[in-house]
């Protein structure tokens, strides 16, 4: 499990020394040694590796990593570029981007371009056993990612949260910074996207907020590979 550095290490490094994290580390290590677990161990903290704390301008909160082969790589909603099947929730995100900003729908689900621009693509649980959704919930990741969210909440600059679905919206009480914008909608899953995710216009709203506050907006267009 590749650790954090830079501003992230300063902000949440103390978590690694807490008893809950020792238990979490032992659990995850045992899972990797006895089962297939996603993402690959070196990718667990990619959300923070790709998006330094002082560069975060948007946080999109997911739940579990994808649990099928060749999908998860440490960024919420994103899949590896070699994965040609775009997950249904991400297909719906692309549809909303197309309707909201006119973005072309790409042939891949690799969202690193967003992460490189300051979009923190964070899951609340950072590992999962293959083909067993939610299998690593309740073992400590939630405490750790709460510390990540708290570190973002403390940033003294404009930041946008996109919270889709009730689990993501359960974090709202933690988000107390008046300089930040909270956007909520149903989850983009096919089960709920038609209840208000489609038409939420979160991507244009985020960019308008960033521009109003002198922050470079996000180029949401993912290019074909």
Task: Go through each PLM region and give its residues.
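A polyanion-binding, active-site-adjacent surface
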Residues: 2, 14-163, 167-170, 175, ...
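Short, contiguous pre-domain boundary segments
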Residues: 5-9
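C-terminal substrate-binding/active-site "lid" region of AdoMet-derived donor-dependent transferases
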Residues: 197
């Amino acid at each position: 499990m590749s650790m954090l550095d830079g501003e992230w290490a300063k902000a949440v490094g103390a978590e690694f020394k807490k008893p809950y994290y020792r238990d979490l580390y032992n659990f995850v290590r045992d899972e990797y040694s006895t089962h297939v677990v996603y993402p690959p161990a070196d990718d667990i903290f990619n959300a923070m590796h790709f998006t330094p704390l002082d560069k975060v301008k948007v946080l999109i909160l997911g739940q579990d990593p994808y649990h099928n082969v060749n999908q998860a790589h440490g960024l919420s909603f994103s899949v590896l570029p070699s994965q040609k099947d775009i997950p249904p929730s991400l297909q719906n995100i692309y549809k909303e981007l197309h309707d909201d900003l006119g973005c072309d729908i790409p042939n891949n689900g690799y969202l690193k371009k967003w992460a490189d621009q300051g979009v923190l693509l964070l899951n609340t649980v950072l590992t999962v056993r293959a083909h067993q959704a939610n299998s690593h919930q309740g073992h400590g990741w939630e405490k750790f990612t709460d510390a990540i969210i708290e570190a973002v909440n403390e940033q003294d600059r404009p930041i946008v949260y996109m919270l889709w679905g009730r689990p993501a919206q359960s974090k709202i009480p933690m988000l107390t910074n008046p300089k930040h914008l909270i956007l909520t909608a149903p989850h983009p899953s096919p089960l709920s996207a038609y209840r208000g995710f489609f038409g939420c216009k979160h991507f244009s709203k985020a960019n308008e907020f960033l521009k109003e506050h002198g922050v470079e907006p996000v180029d949401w267009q993912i290019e074909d590979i």
